[in-house]
Curated annotation (Swiss-Prot):
InterPro entries: Jlp2/Ccd25 (IPR039730), NFACT_RNA-bd (IPR008532). Residues 148-184 have a biased composition (Basic and acidic residues). This is Coiled-coil domain-containing protein 25. Transmembrane receptor that senses neutrophil extracellular traps (NETs) and triggers the ILK-PARVB pathway to enhance cell motility. NETs are mainly composed of DNA fibers and are released by neutrophils to bind pathogens during inflammation. Formation of NETs is also associated with cancer metastasis, NET-DNA acting as a chemotactic factor to attract cancer cells. The gene is CCDC25. Residues 1-66 are extracellular. It is found in: Cell membrane; Endomembrane system. It is a single-pass membrane protein. Residues 21-25 are annotated as: DNA-binding. Residues 84-208 are cytoplasmic. Residues 148-208 are annotated as: Disordered. The keyword Repressor does not apply.
Amino acid sequence: MVFYFTSSSVNSSAYTIYMGKDKYENEDLIKHGWPEDIWFHVDKLSSAHVYLRLHKGENIEDIPKEVLMDCAHLVKANSIQGCKMNNVNVVYTPWSNLKKTADMDVGQIGFHRQKDVKIVTVEKKVNEILNRLEKTKVERFPDLAAEKECRDREERNEKKAQIQEMKKREKEEMKKKREMDELRSYSSLMKVENMSSNQDGNDSDEFM
């Protein structure tokens, strides 16, 4: 089971936030995450793994402040220890930066690059945020592997279409260049022929 929430910013369209039911489900989320996903977790404490799905073309720097705080509050609220504390640090990083090795426990992860891990602090619990998110909560039983494959297939098709379009433009540009070269060559030839014709005419005048 995966829990889905919707977060909105004043200046942007809605974002999807999701998290697993337990650490075993977190394994599937880690395995089948998307490049657009940002992972959140309470720093140095046990908590839920919360993911924010960015819009295509966005990166971690583009997360609206309101959406960032929604994710941070949701993580804090789903930490047995963190939910009782103030000034809780929440770490977040792109899904692609998560590192999972065979010797790690269920639900445990590391990072490929520590420099790509950011921190946001939740000073205290804000019920208004949690109540708003709770109203958007939906429980689903998704086929994460199938959804990931569908996403990847769409990306491959988009890239294929872009390559085809690029080749088409290159072909058109080459054709245009060839036509221009032929036109210049023809114009140059006509100029030479005209000069030759004029010279022939002058020679004839001299013999008359």
